[in-house]
A protein has these predicted regions:
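Bacterial N-terminal signal peptides that target proteins for export
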Residues: 2-12
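Bacterial N-terminal signal peptides
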Residues: 11-21
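N-terminal cleavable signal peptides for secretion/export
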Residues: 25-72, 76-87
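A short, structured loop/turn motif at beta-sheet edges
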Residues: 29-35, 64-73, 100-106, 216-219, ...
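Beta-strand elements of well-folded, non-transmembrane domains
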Residues: 43-47, 63-69, 81-85, 99-103, ...
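Hydrophobic/aromatic beta-strand elements that line small-molecule binding cavities or substrate pockets
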Residues: 59-66, 94-101, 126-128, 246-249
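Hydrophobic/aromatic-rich structural module bridging two neighboring secondary-structure elements via a short loop
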Residues: 77-131
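Mature, soluble, non-transmembrane domains
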Residues: 111-284
Length: 284
């Protein structure tokens, strides 16, 4: 699997990061509170399109979120995938990342390592901060670099909060740029989010780890698809092909199930195989 594509899988972990005490979509609604949780998703090949040189995919994604409104929120993420071309060639990718975001979504720290067949091919280490007129990015790896990006760019936690707030309010389309520290650590992606109709809360006959979890009883959820595009500054063509797209069922508390990772040539399905909902740590 191409390295750039594998690194895009990290966006899922970033978008599910824990947050507490964010503004609600409407004044009368309670604040958006995403629960800390540890989730494992088993990956398989869902669909191979005509030009895909992929016979099978298997792998696993691990997410571990923690933190509180005083210390900020951390995400430990690891994704291992094995791709078989069907011609005797099997490649294994191992992507590991750690992020921290403060409770105000103003500062963001990120590190990642990407291994291909046990060889380290990419390392990223940096931080970003929202300022008055721009967002400043400072990189230590892969090279020392500083740059400013647009002030309207959002970090992963804020991205997911906006999605949930829009879903609560009955919205179905969101369009804004996102910076998550993936790839080379200096790229901004335009995103297009499509939110479907709220699913029935009593329709939970799942065959995955979400089934029978009492803490999910009565929690609203929506089908969501987020597409990521190269940022050109003038994305007007609705036919532009996204670099990557992810679909999932999103609970109001931030837990996701039924993943669909679309890389254009092929689609990977992610089944929630393990879920641990943690207690929220109080501020000291």
């Amino acid at each position: 699997m191409p390295d750039a594509i594998m690194s895009r899988i990290a966006i899922l972990g970033c978008t599910l990061v824990l947050v507490g005490g964010w503004p609600a979509a409407k004044a009368q609604e309670p604040p958006i509170m995403l629960v800390p949780h540890r989730a494992i998703y088993d990956l398989t090949l869902g669909q191979a399109r005509d030009n895909a040189q992929v016979a099978s995919v298997r792998g696993r994604i691990l997410y571990d979120f923690d933190g509180n409104a005083c210390e900020g929120y951390t995400l430990q993420f690891r994704q291992v995938s094995e791709l078989d071309s069907g011609e005797g060639k099997v490649s294994t990718s191992d992507l590991r990342s750690n992020t921290w975001e403060d409770a105000d979504a103003r500062r963001f720290k990120f590190t990642s390592e990407n291994f291909l067949d046990q060889n380290l091919i990419d390392t990223v280490d940096g931080n970003a901060e929202h300022r008055a007129s721009a967002t400043a990015i400072n990189l230590e790896k892969p090279e020392h670099k500083s740059l400013d990006i647009g002030a309207t760019v959002v970090f992963p936690t804020q991205q997911m909060v906006r999605v949930i707030a829009a879903a609560r309010a009955g919205g179905n389309i969101l369009d804004f740029p996102v910076f998550d520290g993936s790839d080379t650590g200096d790229k901004v992606y335009d995103t297009l989010t499509v939110i479907g109709r709220k699913l029935a809360t009593d329709d939970r006959k799942h065959d995955d780890a979400a089934a029978g979890v009492a803490k999910l009883d009565g929690v609203p959820r929506w089908p969501v698809k987020i597409s990521y595009f190269e940022k050109t500054g003038e994305r007007k063509n609705t036919e532009q092909t996204p670099v990557y797209a992810i679909g999932f069922e999103l609970y109001e508390n931030g837990i996701s199930r039924a993943l669909s990772l679309d890389y254009n040539d092929f689609v990977v399905s992610g089944k929630l195989s393990s879920l641990e909902i943690k207690d929220v740590k109080p501020c000291p």
